Amino acid sequence: MLFEGDFEKAIFHHEKAIEICPSDTYHIARYAVLLCYLGEPEKAMEQIKRAIRIDPFCSDLVLETEGLCHFVSGDFSSALTSFKKMQIETRTSLFYTAASLQKMGNSEEAQKILKVAQIESGMDNEKFVSSQLFQKETDKSSLSDALEAI
């Protein structure tokens, strides 16, 4: 539903899944991603903190979503910290790491990471940005502008 653009239905089903199984950190993390896309990174971060309390040895999905929350909130240093905790880098963590590094003025390292992200994912910047379903144009352009500046 999220990828179909039906955010109302996605919210309903995520909240219902969490109601049915409140200790499922996967659903909590996916709900937090949805909240970030809707421009509510603070609410999303509350969900991530809850997931980490439930499982302190959390999955990479929780850490990746934590990094996304920090990026959308403009806390690029904390975003990097979250992505570095991950066991396995993902295309999402690589693109956001590159964007965070660029936002922090570390263009050289950002360029290296972006190259890896593009090669491993087979995606260019535009295709990756279009896969991020931000509803606020400012959130989408923040990511896009950082990646294009590299």
Language model regions located:
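Alpha-helical protein-protein interaction modules
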Residues: 6-150
